[in-house]
Amino acid sequence: MTNTRLDPRAIQKVSGPSWVPLKQTFLDLSEYLLSVSDEATARLTTIYVKYQVASEASDPVFAVAWVKTSREIVVGLALPGERVPDTLKPPLAGLLYPGLTGYLVLRAGDQIPAEFGDWARTAHQTVQGRD
């Protein structure tokens, strides 16, 4: 289970009563993102969880999940510009992170797109290729 690489503070952040409708979505997103590599990790900051290629604080970020509000989760992915699917949104105001190009907004009841695992792998590969 990749939850051992998910910052326990992130799980705690989405464990309050208001997060019940989105907690499993967050855990599922994290599973997709962390399963791209045995080295990938997720670290909570104040309002987002950054998914990195490895565990050092300075390691590249390939995805970010904003958990600012329990009404929605916004996930940004570092996809190559020519490979950003039409189903993803461009960078959203106030939710910018360097290198992220495609954004997915999930609210209670929304399904994670079937392609999300592929997008996560592509984002991870894209960031690793920048080194």
Per-region residue spans from a language model:
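Charge-rich, low-complexity N-terminal segments
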Residues: 1-31
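Append "and, occasionally, other polyanion-binding protein interfaces
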Residues: 25, 37-39, 63
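A mid-sequence, solvent-exposed acidic-amphipathic segment
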Residues: 32-37, 41-44
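Short, conserved beta-strand/beta-arch hydrophobic-aromatic motifs that form part
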Residues: 43-103
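Well-ordered alpha/beta subsegment
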Residues: 95-131
